[in-house]
């Protein structure tokens, strides 16, 4: 029997940008950000350097081994090797769950994430998973990936009233990867892309930035995240 009331659960997330700053020896910048108590323009001196760190965070992500390899070597090729190994491990793990048919569905959804986010309309489209795919065929696999913590499904909210759930569009949602570094590697996007001015905010039509914001918010949220559109 499960020991009800005797087990404490803890959710694990990728390392945050704050932890990345500390790992890079930039605790002063982390302290500066932590001291902000209102929305205000960041002085150019801090802004330029924070964006430099953010570019590296987008490239490496927050998976502990990948971040550790970056701190140890400063070699993005070694970081890419770690990220590729992680992605390969996930795929191999899919094979253990539900037989060949379920493995195919898990892999197809997982490998479609970067393509889905690169679309002009970033709403999740089942047909982008496999031509002719329907929700009823793949919903169980999508739920498995979410329960495993590999993806986050974010519902479209059409209202803004209370409760938010009353205004959810149950047919429209976006799917994000657990980590921006894994997303970059999954998309086979070279880290040098983020060396270009503002590329971190524009690649994948801004979805890398969206994925980062969600990744930063999730450890702080006590409710399911939503998105809205003005279209």
Locate each region found by the language model.
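Interdomain motor-coupling "hinge/lid" segment immediately C-terminal to the ATP-binding subdomain
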Residues: 2-118
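Accessory nucleic acid-recognition modules appended to NTPase machines
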Residues: 67-231
């Amino acid at each position: 029997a499960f020991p009800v009331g005797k087990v404490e659960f803890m959710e694990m997330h990728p390392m945050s940008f704050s932890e990345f700053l500390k790992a890079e020896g930039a605790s002063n910048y982390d302290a500066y950000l932590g001291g902000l108590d209102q929305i205000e323009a960041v002085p150019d001196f801090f802004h330029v350097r924070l964006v430099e760190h953010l570019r590296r965070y987008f490239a490496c992500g927050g998976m502990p081994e990948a971040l550790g390899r970056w701190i140890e070597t400063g070699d993005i090729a070694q970081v890419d090797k770690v990220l590729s190994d992680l992605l390969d491990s996930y795929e191999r793990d899919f094979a253990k769950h539900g037989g060949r048919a379920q493995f195919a569905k898990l892999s197809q959804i997982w490998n479609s994430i970067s393509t889905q986010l690169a679309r002009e309309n970033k709403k999740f489209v089942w047909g982008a998973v496999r031509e002719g795919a329907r929700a009823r065929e793949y919903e169980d696999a999508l739920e498995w990936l979410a329960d495993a913590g590999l993806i986050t499904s974010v519902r479209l909210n059409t209202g803004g009233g209370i409760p938010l759930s009353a205004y959810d569009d149950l047919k429209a949602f976006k799917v994000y990867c657990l980590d921006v570094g894994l997303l970059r590697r999954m998309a086979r996007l070279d880290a040098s892309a983020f060396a270009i001015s503002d590329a971190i905010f524009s690649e994948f039509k801004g979805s890398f930035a969206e994925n980062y914001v969600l990744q930063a918010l999730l450890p702080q949220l006590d409710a399911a995240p939503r998105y809205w559109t003005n279209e």
